[in-house]
Amino acid sequence: MGSQKSVSFGDPPGREVRSQSKIKKVNFRLYLITDRKLVARCSLAAAVEEALKGGVKAVQLREKDLEIRELLQMAYKMREITKKYKAKLFINDRVDIALAVDADGVHLGQSSIPPSAVRKVAGNKLIIGASTHGIKEALETEKSGADFITFGPIYKTPSKLKYGKPPGIDVLRKVKSKVSIPVFAIGGIKTDMVKEVMDAGADGIALISGILGAEDIAERTREFLRVLK
C-alpha cells in the first residue's frame, strides 16, 4: 500500500493515530464495483465469484436501479459469497442494507448523506468509503469522516462521462498530497496504466468494466493484481 503522509505541525492532535487505524481497515488494493448490465454471459453473483477466485478482496455492490427488496436479496447473496473468500463487502449508499446484511462498509456518493451522519447511525460498525471528483470534495469528505475515497475519473471512461473532462494524474497527485486517508484511483484504468497511477501516489485502484467486461474475469483480476504488487 502507498506510503502514508507524515503528520505536519498544523495537524490536529490525534490525526496521525486516526489515519493509521483507518489504513489498517482498508487492507486491499483492488476494489471491484458491480454493474450487472456489463455481465451478459452469467449472473452478477457468478461474475463476482470469478473475480473473488482471481483474488479480489473488496467488492462494492452498486446496483442503483434495483427495487429495495431485490437489492436486499442481492446483498445477502453477495455477503455469502464474499465471506466464502474472506473478502470485504461494501454497499453503495444504503446504510440500512449494509447493516442488515452485516456488510463491512458502505460507499457514499456526493449526493448521499455525509460520512459524519453515517457514523451517527452506524458508529464504528461500518468502514466508510466515498466517491470524489475534485480536490475540494476530497478534503471535505476526509473531514466528514470517510475512511477512504475513490478519486476520478483519472482517464476517460463511459461510466463517468457526466463528470466532464477527467482530472487526470496531476490532480490525483495533488489529492494524495493533501489527504491522509487511502485514495483509490478510478476511471478508465487498464493494466498498462496501473504503474502511472500508483506512481502518482494512489493506494489502489477501483474497477468496474475493467474486470466485469472481461471474457475471463478471474484471469483479468489476476493480471491487475500482478501489476499492483
List the model feature ranges, each with a label:
Residues A98, Y155-L161:
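A short acidic, helix-capping loop that chelates divalent metal ions and anchors anionic groups
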Residues S6:
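Short, structured segments at the rim of ligand-binding sites
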Residues G10-V17:
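Short Gly/Ser/Thr- and charged-rich N-terminal loops/segments
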Residues G2, S21-I113, R119-D147, G164, ...:
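Conserved N-terminal beta1-alpha1 strand-loop-helix module at the mouth
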Residues G168, A185-K190:
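Glycine-rich adenosine-cofactor-binding loop
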Residues V197:
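Active-site helix-to-loop segments that bind/position phosphate- or nucleotide-bearing substrates
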Residues G201-G210:
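Short, electropositive alpha-helical surface patch
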